[in-house]
Amino acid sequence: MLRLLIGLLLMSFISLQSASWQEPLRVSIEFVDLPKKIIRFPAHDLQVGEFGFVVTKLSDYEIVNSEVVIIAVENGVATAKFRAFESMKQRHLPTPRMVARKGDLVYFRQFNNQAFLIAPNDELYEQIRATNTDINFISSDLLVTFLNGFDPKIANLRKACNVYSVGVIYIVTTNTLNILSCESFEILEKRELDTSGVTKTSTPFFSRVEGIDAGTLGKLFSGSQSKNYFAYYDALVKKEKRKEVRIKKREEKIDSREIKREIKQEAIKEPKKANQGTQNAPTLEEKNYQKAERKLDAKEERRYLRDERKKAKATKKAMEFEEREKEHDERDEQETEGRRKALEMDKGDKKEERVKPKENEREIKQEAIKEPSDGNNATQQGEKQNAPKENNAQKEENKPNSKEEKRRLKEEKKKAKAEQRAREFEQRAREHQERDEKELEERRKALEAGKK
């Protein structure tokens, strides 16, 4: 009991003395190197490994354009690497194309008042919660449910932090309480903690949730290594620490001469004034900005040219379609006109054929009535001779009438067929013209939509 009280007092004293990483901080960027994706700003009390995000203020709103991790602190200047902001990645939302620039604000420790706590048993869990009243500890039940029976990995812990807006993770290892940044997994603070009295541990850590099973395949891949609590979490923290040391050494291999030259250029606030009032040579930061802007302009130019080519192709296709439509209409009009003329000529021929039989009948009748009848002087023999002549004339009149009737019926049938074909042709021509007009209208609408 005495040991527990001493531990509580020690933890309370340490928590009161080291709370700088909990207070939110906002700093302004003083230097940007776009090719290397490095920014510099006043360090204040920032530590290596702390995570933040860059905010750019526009006309009437602000936008988060990138996230940063501090890689070095020297002479009151913090150096950080920045990358695309992916903590709230959502493929259905627009992706910002802006990058960090001088004058933007970097926000740190915005979520450091919320934390996950990984402890081996309920005693240490409640002890740490009681001695850190200024921290809002998210229930470990949520974290163990999120892991779904698998061993805690750094990638999974980062995802859980993003889901629940958590900034730090408290992990109990052998005789140590480690406070790590969620995003960089860098150790922000270490506190001594007596764990010699721990005889029984929970898997993967203490929580009130039981019965979560990853299944046979899940156990095969996860390995259930967290059953040995202290061995697993000691190795997890040391592994990440070795990784961060390697990253730090790799970042320190950046050309020191170039860094010193850049710092000197930034230290000179007032540019040298030329005698003739000429403009000064651009600084390294301005060159980097100009280079990045040229890249963006080149991309925009390529995109603009690609869109223009597409529009030109669409316009050319529309013009070709209109020309083909005009040619087709002209050809249809010529064919229709030819059919109409042929039909009119057929009608004229039939009228002439109808007039000729009538004229023939009149001529026959007139010839028959040329010789006057001499009733008083005509003999019976003359009457007998005239009778067969009249019968023959009637037969001749009947014969031409029957032939003309047949011819007339044939001509009427031909005329009916020609009229029917002409009507069918006109109907097909109208349908074809309507269909072409609809297609042309659809092409024009598509072209207008493409131009917009």
From Swiss-Prot:
Residues 374-391 have a biased composition (Polar residues). Pfam families: PGBA_C, PGBA_N. GO terms for cellular component: cell surface. InterPro entries: PGBA_C (IPR032737), PgbA_N (IPR029276). Residues 284-310, 317-373, 392-452 have a biased composition (Basic and acidic residues). Coiled coil: none annotated. Residues 265-452 are annotated as: Disordered. It is found in: Cell surface. It comes from the Bacteria. Plasminogen bound to PgbA is capable of being converted to functionally active plasmin. Binds plasminogen, specifically, and in a concentration and lysine-dependent manner. Plasminogen is the precursor of plasmin, a serine protease that cleaves fibrin, fibronectin, laminin and vitronectin. Acquisition of plasminogen/plasmin could enable H.pylori to degrade host components. This is Plasminogen-binding protein PgbA. It comes from Helicobacter pylori (strain ATCC 700392 / 26695).
